[in-house]
Design a protein with these regions (language model features):
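A short glycine-rich, hydrophobically flanked beta-strand micro-motif that places a catalytic Asp/Glu
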Residues: 57-69
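Peripheral (often C-terminal) accessory segments that flank ATP-dependent C-N-forming ligase machineries
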Residues: 67, 98-141
Length: 141
């Protein structure tokens, strides 16, 4: 009944470096078509406990769904990046890059997150006689 969060977490040996709650605003089946990064202290604290308890490292996707009373409930813990991984990257924290740095034994930098909204949409691209084109409001058929 409540909001759903796909939270991007980056950790090292049980210590959380980053926690980026991603509010899934518009869904179609399981895909986010509108989402935004959004601070959420309750979810951030829950993620910190999960990371410590499970001694997690690297990228982890932790999903929550709020009850009607706005209490976040854990849905799943995924040992992978989520489907909207581009959103934290555009917001200032490139999590796949940080995973590479971790694997190379390099120091994980401190970065600042800027709250960002993502809108995903479909469009048609046509290929005809080796020409690629789109049909938009300015096109004539």
């Amino acid at each position: 009944p409540g909001d759903e969060y796909s939270t991007y977490v980056f950790a090292e040996k049980g210590k959380m470096h980053y926690c980026i709650p991603n509010l899934r605003q518009k869904l179609d089946r399981y895909y986010s078509f509108e989402a935004k990064t959004q601070k959420n202290p309750k979810i951030e604290n829950m993620c910190k406990k999960i990371v410590k308890e499970l001694d997690l490292s690297s990228n982890v996707n932790i999903q929550f769904k709020n009850t009607k009373n706005k209490i976040p409930k854990l849905i799943e813990i995924n040992p992978r990046i989520g489907g909207t991984i581009i959103l934290p990257s555009v917001s200032g924290i490139n999590l796949p890059y940080l995973a590479v740095k971790l694997c190379l034994g390099e120091k994980i930098p401190t970065k600042k997150l800027t709250e960002t909204k993502m809108i995903r949409y479909w469009k048609e691209v046509f290929i005809k006689d080796s020409e690629t084109f789109e049909i938009n409001n300015n096109s004539r058929i």
